[in-house]
């Protein structure tokens, strides 16, 4: 009988706690205090991976997923939405710390030399003009036949 009388109280407590974050707003100070925990855990896990493998996502994807989930949970716990500019700045800092040397060398594309480029442009244009002329000439010729 005592537990039945507590159920409405528990329900009200859950409803109040669920809306507290929305009513109280985002506590950015607490968020910035809590996010480094995620970064510390991620850094400890990244020590298990050889530095030269830090650019190979398959080597640390599980750690990175945990890091992302941790930042999301810590942000939501203090009543903030995720992602937000402060959390994003923190995540960017972690990226700079671990992945700043992971730039991808992109192939620099250059135009071919003029000796190759001019025929590649001119031949289709001349073929188009020649075929159009041929079609016009043939259509005029059929009109003249009895």
UniProtKB/Swiss-Prot annotation:
Coiled coil: none annotated. InterPro entries: RAMP, RAMP_sf. Pfam families: RAMP. Its main location: membrane. Residues 1-21 form the signal peptide. Glycans are attached at residues 27, 69, 101. It is found in: Cell membrane; Membrane. It comes from the Eukaryota. The chain crosses the membrane at residues 117-136. Residues 22-116 are extracellular. It is a single-pass type I membrane protein. Keywords: Cell membrane, Disulfide bond, Glycoprotein, Membrane, Receptor, Signal, Transmembrane, Transmembrane helix, Transport. The keyword Magnesium does not apply. Belongs to the RAMP family. Heterodimer of CALCRL and RAMP3. Interacts with GPER1. Plays a role in cardioprotection by reducing cardiac hypertrophy and perivascular fibrosis in a GPER1-dependent manner. Transports the calcitonin gene-related peptide type 1 receptor (CALCRL) and GPER1 to the plasma membrane. Acts as a receptor for adrenomedullin (AM) together with CALCRL. This is Receptor activity-modifying protein 3. It comes from Cavia porcellus (Guinea pig). The lineage of its organism: Eukaryota, Metazoa, Chordata, Craniata, Vertebrata. The gene is RAMP3.
């Amino acid at each position: 009988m005592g537990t039945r009388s507590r159920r409405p109280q528990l329900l009200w407590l859950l409803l109040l706690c669920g809306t507290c974050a929305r009513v109280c707003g985002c506590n950015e100070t607490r968020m910035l205090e809590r996010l480094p925990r995620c970064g510390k855990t991620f850094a400890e896990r990244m020590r298990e991976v050889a530095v030269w493998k830090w650019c190979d996502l398959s080597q640390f994807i599980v750690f990175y997923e945990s890091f992302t989930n941790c930042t999301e949970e810590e942000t939501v716990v203090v009543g903030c939405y995720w992602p937000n500019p402060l959390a994003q700045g923190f995540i960017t800092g972690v990226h700079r710390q671990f992945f700043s040397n992971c730039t991808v060398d992109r192939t620099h594309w250059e135009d071919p030399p003029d000796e190759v480029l001019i025929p590649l442009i001119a031949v289709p244009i001349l073929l188009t003009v020649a075929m159009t002329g041929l079609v016009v000439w043939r259509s005029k010729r059929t009109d003249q036949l009895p």
